[in-house]
């Protein structure tokens, strides 16, 4: 098979809707892209299935997402997770003893609280009889937490589950070198002074060099940013196009923030600091300013920069998921149904960031829907180049036929329906918490805009991906 990264643009549809739409006008200046036009709820079939429980999102919250190294820098992950859980309890008034199970996603684990779901639950005042576990699946960890909750409820094991995610990039674990760790363990086992002196005599200064957390893929030894740069080149996505998309994300996020649309954000009183009330990474700039930045990964000719990449972020999120009959019995008005979902994986070398392209047609087929049925799209924005590459791949018959074994492309999401309240580029991306943010953004947008179906999709390290259909709850 021809390598994706050596396949040139001449083999992609030069006159695709995306090429025309994206290259002919600045994304930041189109009124269509500033917000979706309000529409009446369309009359479509529901995705309810006979003899299968309807599962709903009652509500969801998140702490403000902050640039790492700012107001959350002195906290631990369980502090943020506890804040999200406490915010959810306050928002929903759900009795703690009604919650059957708690699941949190995270990526970079703090050893002291390796099961951060359990520690955060206890810290938030949940019963010690409420089980909790932590999952990890890179950037789709909280997606996995939510779908695990769906499975527990669908199988009848639970009626009420809290799912969420957390990431604290301000204090990542930094270990001693392997040689130093081995020496310290050997010293701990030594029984005599002579044995200890013998071990110490082997010490060398380079043992003190710290072992930093890996930023590259274990299987390929390539950083995600480097992969994004190669992917952008493979799909002939220019630096200007990437900067335009990033500016769009920040502009829409700022607009949504100013209009009070980011209602899932709950204030958090940081111990010893002021109360944090909003995301602090939203930074509408200008294309001229963004163009001044140097490439961040492939130098000097790469196109991925700090401006068109998501930034290191601290934050936590949580959603209350219930069986519909339980929610109604408790007097709740749910926000949305969680419907079909799909996980995919592909080549982590050349297709690391193409999870949405692979997952989208599969979840649509599973749900019996088409792209035209979707009213709201919420895709994770790891990099501008990643988003634009996915959009081009989704709009390419050649890619569908040669890489996905499909007869035709799935099609291009209309930009007027796409990430209209900003995305990970602007709001931030705490690895373990983004999935819940995506679902709540879709649910809240459906309610605001009068749509019925939302599609959530994300890529993840390891060449994995996720997509889910969210259906608006009837008003």
From Swiss-Prot:
Its biological purpose: Mitochondrial trifunctional enzyme catalyzes the last three of the four reactions of the mitochondrial beta-oxidation pathway. The mitochondrial beta-oxidation pathway is the major energy-producing process in tissues and is performed through four consecutive reactions breaking down fatty acids into acetyl-CoA. Among the enzymes involved in this pathway, the trifunctional enzyme exhibits specificity for long-chain fatty acids.
Keywords: Acetylation, Acyltransferase, Endoplasmic reticulum, Fatty acid metabolism, Lipid metabolism, Membrane, Mitochondrion, Mitochondrion inner membrane, Mitochondrion outer membrane, Transferase, Transit peptide
PROSITE patterns: THIOLASE_1, THIOLASE_2, THIOLASE_3
Subunit structure: Heterotetramer of 2 alpha/HADHA and 2 beta/HADHB subunits; forms the mitochondrial trifunctional enzyme. Also purified as higher order heterooligomers including a 4 alpha/HADHA and 4 beta/HADHB heterooligomer which physiological significance remains unclear. The mitochondrial trifunctional enzyme interacts with MTLN. Interacts with RSAD2/viperin.
Protein name, as recorded: Trifunctional enzyme subunit beta, mitochondrial
Stretches within the membrane that do not traverse it: 174-221
Annotated pathway: Lipid metabolism; fatty acid beta-oxidation
EC number: 2.3.1.155, 2.3.1.16
Localization annotation: Mitochondrion; Mitochondrion inner membrane; Mitochondrion outer membrane; Endoplasmic reticulum
InterPro entries noted in UniProt: Thiolase, Thiolase-like, Thiolase_acyl_enz_int_AS, Thiolase_AS, Thiolase_C, Thiolase_CS, Thiolase_N
Record's catalysed reaction(s): an acyl-CoA + acetyl-CoA = a 3-oxoacyl-CoA + CoA; butanoyl-CoA + acetyl-CoA = 3-oxohexanoyl-CoA + CoA; hexanoyl-CoA + acetyl-CoA = 3-oxooctanoyl-CoA + CoA; octanoyl-CoA + acetyl-CoA = 3-oxodecanoyl-CoA + CoA
NCBIfam families per UniProt: AcCoA-C-Actrans
Organelle transit peptide: 1-34
Molecular function per GO: acetyl-CoA C-acetyltransferase activity; acetyl-CoA C-myristoyltransferase activity
Residues bearing the modification N6-succinyllysine: 73, 189, 191, 292, 294, 333
Protein family: Belongs to the thiolase-like superfamily. Thiolase family.
A Gene Ontology term for the protein's cellular component: mitochondrial outer membrane
Residues with the N6-acetyllysine modification: 73, 189, 294, 299, 333, 349, 362
Active site, per annotation: 139, 459
Gene that produces this protein: HADHB
């Amino acid at each position: 098979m021809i390598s994706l990264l050596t396949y040139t643009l001449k083999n992609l549809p030069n006159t695709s809707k995306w090429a025309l739409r994206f290259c002919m006008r600045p994304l930041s200046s189109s009124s269509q892209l500033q917000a979706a036009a309000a529409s009446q709820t369309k009359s479509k079939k529901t995705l309810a299935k006979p003899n299968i429980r309807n599962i709903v999102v009652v509500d969801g919250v998140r702490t403000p997402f902050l640039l790492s190294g700012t107001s959350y820098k002195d906290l631990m992950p369980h502090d943020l997770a506890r804040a999200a859980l406490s915010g959810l309890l306050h928002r929903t008034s759900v009795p703690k003893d009604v919650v059957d199970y708690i699941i949190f996603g995270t990526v970079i684990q703090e050893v002291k609280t390796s099961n951060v779901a359990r520690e955060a639950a206890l810290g938030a005042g949940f019963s010690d009889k409420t089980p909790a576990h932590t999952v990890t699946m890179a950037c789709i960890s909280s997606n996995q937490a939510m779908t695990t909750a769906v499975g527990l409820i669908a199988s009848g094991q639970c009626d009420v589950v809290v799912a969420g995610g957390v990431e604290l990039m301000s204090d990542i674990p930094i270990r001693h070198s392997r040689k130093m760790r081995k020496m310290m363990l050997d010293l701990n086992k030594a029984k005599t002074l002579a044995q200890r002196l013998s071990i110490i005599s082997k010490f060398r200064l380079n043992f003190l060099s710290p072992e930093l957390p890996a930023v590259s893929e274990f299987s390929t030894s390539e950083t995600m940013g480097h992969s994004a740069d190669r992917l952008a080149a493979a799909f002939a996505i220019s630096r200007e196009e990437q900067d335009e998309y990033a500016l769009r994300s920040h502009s829409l996020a700022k607009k949504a923030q100013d209009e009070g649309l980011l209602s899932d954000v709950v204030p958090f009183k940081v111990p010893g600091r002021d109360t944090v009330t909003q995301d602090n990474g939203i930074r509408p700039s200008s294309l001229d300013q963004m163009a001044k930045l140097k490439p961040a990964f492939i130098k000097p000719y790469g196109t991925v920069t700090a401006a068109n990449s998501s930034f290191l972020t601290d934050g936590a999120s949580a959603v209350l998921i219930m069986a519909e009959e339980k929610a109604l019995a408790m007097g709740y008005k749910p926000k949305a149904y969680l419907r079909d979902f799909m996980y995919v994986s592909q080549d982590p070398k050349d297709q690391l960031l193409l999870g949405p392209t692979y997952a989208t047609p599969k979840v649509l087929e599973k749900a019996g829907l088409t792209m035209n049925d979707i009213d709201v799209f919420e895709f994770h924005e790891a990099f501008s180049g990643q988003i634009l590459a996915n959009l081009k791949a989704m709009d390419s018959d050649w890619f569908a036929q040669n890489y996905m074994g499909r007869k035709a492309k799935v099609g291009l999401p209309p930009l007027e329906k796409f990430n209209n309240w900003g995305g990970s580029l602007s709001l931030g991306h705490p690895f373990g918490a983004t999935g819940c943010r995506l679902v709540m953004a879709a649910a809240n947008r459906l309610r605001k805009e009068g749509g019925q179906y939302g599609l959530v999709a994300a890529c993840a390290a390891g060449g994995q991906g996720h997509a889910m259909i969210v259906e608006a709850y009837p008003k």
